């Protein structure tokens, strides 16, 4: 190699998009956060918590990896469900490569088999990522990996426990090596392409999931209405939680406002950690009839409105 060769030519940068595909609750959002090293996407035990495409951005060596956390793929019933599943598959087709996640405990169940069948139409290189390996015996993991590779021609197979971080570094390095040559698309210190207003709304939505255990969270959405930087270095945030019926509004508020206070306290603490400054969070709960059938709400969530 010539001594006068510029460093950027000696080590050309790489950059590409990686779509994470899998059934609900296989751990896609947890894996994105583990790969990035920071929380960029909502995590909950409840299914269907990721609604739109959220991108986490990782720099590993000379490569920038743009991770696309897609909604979980399942059999859609409602209009919102159809939009989420359609968005997930569009993310797979548009990416440079695909990471297919399997839950080690569930294995190749009916949902996974349906995803594998549709994956045959996706021509990009594919990695198989078996998650939650700490919960399953080694023999079962090896058998699952063999069965999956007999179904789909995966370039590589990885065993990870996203929650603890086990195996995540190996996956990150392999993704970096697989990225095509090209310039970085984002600043090196940027961890997500989602604006802070959106991340703050996602955090509050996560706290709704954690504080309420009925079907209600799937019939609610959060919008950041106001974000004001204060002279004392703090930030004042106003958010509205929209529900479809007045009975749902009462559930979110809770007896004596206890539930909304708990949601607000949890959300405020986490938003403050992300923005690195004190946060004054004000939550309002409003009824918006049939918001799940409003095209404008879909655009706000980054989803395409299904016509049928």
Swiss-Prot record:
Q: Which GO terms describe its biological process?
A: ribosomal small subunit assembly
Q: How does it sit in the membrane?
A: Peripheral membrane protein
> What residue spans carry the region label G1?
22-29
Binding-site residues, GTP: 22-29, 69-73, 131-134
Pfam families, A to Z: KH_2 (PF07650), MMR_HSR1 (PF01926)
Domain annotation Era-type G: ranges: 14-181
Region listing for G2, in residue ranges: 48-52
Q: Which UniProt keywords apply?
A: Cell inner membrane, Cell membrane, Cytoplasm, GTP-binding, Membrane, Nucleotide-binding, Ribosome biogenesis, RNA-binding, rRNA-binding
Annotated compartments: Cytoplasm; Cell inner membrane
Q: Which SUPFAM superfamilies match?
A: P-loop containing nucleoside triphosphate hydrolases, Prokaryotic type KH domain (KH-domain type II)
What's one GO-annotated cellular component? cytosol
Q: Where is this region: G4?
A: 131-134
Please describe what this protein does: An essential GTPase that binds both GDP and GTP, with rapid nucleotide exchange. Plays a role in 16S rRNA processing and 30S ribosomal subunit biogenesis and possibly also in cell cycle regulation and energy metabolism.
Protein name stated in the entry? GTPase Era
Instruction: Please spell out the taxonomic lineage of the organism that makes this protein.
Output: Bacteria, Pseudomonadati, Pseudomonadota, Alphaproteobacteria, Hyphomicrobiales
Question: What gene is this protein a product of?
Answer: era
